From Swiss-Prot:
Name of the protein this chain belongs to: Polyamine aminopropyltransferase
A Pfam family per the record: Spermine_synt_N
Record-linked InterPro entries: PABS, PABS_CS, SAM-dependent_MTases_sf, Spermi_synthase, Spermidine_synt_N, Spermidine_synt_N_sf
PROSITE patterns: PABS_1, PABS_2
Function field: Catalyzes the irreversible transfer of a propylamine group from the amino donor S-adenosylmethioninamine (decarboxy-AdoMet) to putrescine (1,4-diaminobutane) to yield spermidine.
SUPFAM superfamilies xref list: S-adenosyl-L-methionine-dependent methyltransferases (SSF53335)
Keywords from the named record: Cytoplasm, Polyamine biosynthesis, Spermidine biosynthesis, Transferase
Taxonomic placement: Bacteria, Bacillati, Bacillota, Bacilli, Bacillales
Length: 275
């Protein structure tokens, strides 16, 4: 008997994948967690029935949420990841030699635990001595931080359940306070096909807080529509004004200096969402 998984991404649209086997399933204190092995995308993490990451295409998301802000900042030393319990963002952050400390704050320790077990190529850097892993509420962690981080990345789930407050204006105001005077933050902000209001509202909220605010995109096959947005807010450094000499060699599969620049070239319908 064949086993197929379908993520219903809207009421009329979804993505379906053939499953080899279920690796782990558990109702944590915060969400339904499933690890499955797929035929096409390798091992896959699902939270509340939604695809979070897969072994085959994870590099796109993790490279784009990290390298864009890290190359924009001239000397990032202390970096915070809110969410991101799979460890992929941490893996990419540590490719930057200037980084002295990377802090990861995820509310659900089970995501961290089972990512280490079933997604070892993604979670491979979580034991690095430069990494401080905290199982805690990212919203509260931000509220208790001030002038501490060079770069903050919000690697959250969809805006439902415990992650909903990570898409609110008050959270972005807290991030601004938690950043140093030339700090940068980036958040994944869903897709512009099915969640246009979210993309628009987050961008406008961030723009009212950060003097430099931009939106960029990446192509991620297993995410809704395959087109994903990231909103970046910066106090001083413009991601479109990065000097060519700042780009150093990092081992990537998607991100390049050309991709860095091209990601900010938006289709007209996405530009219109930001007006």
């Amino acid at each position: 008997m064949e086993f197929w998984f379908t993520e219903k991404q809207t009421e009329r649209f979804g993505i379906t994948m053939k499953i080899k086997r279920t690796l782990h399933t558990e109702k944590t204190d915060f969400q339904q967690l499933d690890m499955v092995e797929t035929e096409e995308f390798g091992n896959m993490l699902l939270l509340d029935g939604m695809v979070m990451t897969t072994e085959k295409d994870e590099f796109v998301y993790h490279e784009m949420v990290t390298h864009v802000p890290l190359f924009t900042h001239p000397n990032p030393k202390h970096v915070l990841v809110v969410g991101g319990g799979d460890g992929g963002a941490i893996r990419e952050i540590l490719k930057h030699p200037s980084v002295e400390k990377a802090t990861l704050v995820d509310i659900d320790g089970k995501v961290i635990e089972y990512s280490k077990t079933y997604l070892p190529t993604i979670a491979c850097a979580l034991e690095d001595e430069r990494v401080d892993v905290k199982v805690a509420d990212g919203f509260m962690h931000i509220a208790q931080s001030a002038n501490e981080y060079d770069v903050i990345m919000v690697d959250s789930t969809e805006p439902v359940g415990p992650a909903a407050k990570l898409f609110e204006r008050g959270f972005y105001e807290g991030i601004s306070k938690a950043l140093k005077e030339d700090g940068i933050f980036v958040a994944q902000t869903d897709n512009p096909w099915f969640h246009q209001e979210l993309v628009s509202n987050v961008y406008k909220d961030v723009k009212e807080i950060f003097p430099i605010t931009r939106l960029y995109t990446a192509n991620i096959p297993t995410y809704p529509s395959g087109m994903w947005t990231f909103t970046i807010g910066s106090k001083k450094h413009d991601p479109l004004a990065v000097e060519a000499t700042r780009f150093h060699d990092v081992q990537t599969k998607y991100y390049t200096p050309d991709i860095h620049r091209a990601a900010f070239v938006l289709p007209k319908f996405v530009q219109d969402l930001l007006k």
